[in-house]
Amino acid sequence: MIYTNNIFNFLTLFVSILIFLITTLITFAAHFLPSRNTDSEKSSPYECGFDPLNSARVPFSFRFFLVAILFLLFDLEIALLFPLPFSVFFHPIHTPLILTVGLIFEWVQGGLDWAE
């Protein structure tokens, strides 16, 4: 029993060191192997599809802003749902009910309609 435990510990250590060495080798290989050809396309900045040579004050649709804010709001509320099964003080049906009512309200008000 003691002998197999020592072998298991040795194999665990060996595999850990082997994984570390392989990862280090791949990291150094990725750093030294790529070609250093820089052209105008690779060295030019790219900002989410906007041309960086024009004005940075390009107006965009208020509808896009509204959908982005709604996404952040519902995303935050979904993130708050994760600890809900462990909650003792709050009944688990209240938060999904509030989320559903908010979603239905936005749907009825037309906040989720992209094209008018």
UniProtKB/Swiss-Prot annotation:
GO terms for cellular component: mitochondrial membrane; NADH dehydrogenase complex. The keyword Mitochondrion applies. It is found in: Mitochondrion membrane. It is an enzyme of class 7 (translocase). It is a multi-pass membrane protein. Its main location: mitochondrion. The chain crosses the membrane at residues 10-30, 64-84, 88-108. Its EC number is 7.1.1.2. Pfam families: Oxidored_q4. It catalyses: a ubiquinone + NADH + 5 H(+)(in) = a ubiquinol + NAD(+) + 4 H(+)(out). It comes from the Eukaryota. The keyword Glycoprotein does not apply. Belongs to the complex I subunit 3 family. Core subunit of the mitochondrial membrane respiratory chain NADH dehydrogenase (Complex I) that is believed to belong to the minimal assembly required for catalysis. Complex I functions in the transfer of electrons from NADH to the respiratory chain. The immediate electron acceptor for the enzyme is believed to be ubiquinone. This is NADH-ubiquinone oxidoreductase chain 3.
